[in-house]
């Protein structure tokens, strides 16, 4: 089992953990419907960047 050679100071420990924070997912609002969706993904109504790109069950 690995054993550290020197104790890591609280400052260095904090620097090591500085990139471990969780980020909120990037969301966007569809301009035509006003729905919130993940960026670079189709909205639940089938719109992407203001254009209808996918037929949904509601359309049929």
Swiss-Prot record:
Note the superkingdom of the native organism: Bacteria
Q: What is this protein called?
A: Large ribosomal subunit protein bL32
Report if keyword Nucleus is assigned.
no
SUPFAM superfamilies hit by this protein = Zn-binding ribosomal proteins
Q: Name one GO biological process term.
A: translation
- Similarity comment: Belongs to the bacterial ribosomal protein bL32 family.
Alphabetical UniProt keywords: Ribonucleoprotein, Ribosomal protein
Ranges annotated as biased composition (Basic residues): 9-19
Pfam families to which the protein is assigned, alphabetical:
Ribosomal_L32p
| Stretches the record annotates as Disordered | 1-46
**Phylogenetic lineage:** Bacteria, Pseudomonadati, Pseudomonadota, Betaproteobacteria, Burkholderiales
Q: Which GO MF term does the entry hold, naming one?
A: structural constituent of ribosome
List the GO terms this entry assigns under cellular component, sorted alphabetically: large ribosomal subunit
Keyword Ribosomal protein listed? The answer is yes
